[in-house]
């Protein structure tokens, strides 16, 4: 995401802070709309007052739900403060207004993960599997299926995907894990080794080593 609209050019003097904030407070009395609140949030953030900055941006978006710069800043500050409910609320607005902007999509995904909202996360990925970022959505959904022990769903989703995109390490990783969990060890090992060739991954390497050890044990018991 772009940096916060923090007006970093303001020098960190108490006097300057008072002058600028007073200007916007007077304008707020005259206009009583979102714009002075937005700028008050900016100046407070620039001088390190994150809590009051967030409050001003919240007031700004309560007056104008379509004030994108205020939402943008509020979301970034909420992420920094790890206030994920607030971040998710703002990102629903930003994603609605910019449905193909990947930085908002991926950050909203991160917020849903932090909140543990698995059903909403599944719906979110499903809503994008036919869009411009379908590779990301399919791999994200597949990984969600793996994490929630839905290996068969992951296998069905990733099998045609890997045939179409055979050189994507994450897709190969998901298909490899789902194959192993459904007792297709040889196929799973092949997918995981191919994934590892394309991208170093400690989890994949650990799985490959584990499957190879299991094969040796089984071979020795014959």
Swiss-Prot record:
Q: Which SMART domains match?
A: TPR
Q: Give the TPR repeat ranges.
A: 34-67, 169-202
Keywords for the protein's UniProt record, in alphabetical order: Repeat, TPR repeat
Q: What's the superkingdom here?
A: Bacteria
- PROSITE patterns tied to this protein: TPR_REGION (PS50293)
What name is this protein filed under? TPR repeat-containing protein BH2049
This protein's species is: Halalkalibacterium halodurans (strain ATCC BAA-125 / DSM 18197 / FERM 7344 / JCM 9153 / C-125) (Bacillus halodurans)
Organism phylogeny: Bacteria, Bacillati, Bacillota, Bacilli, Bacillales
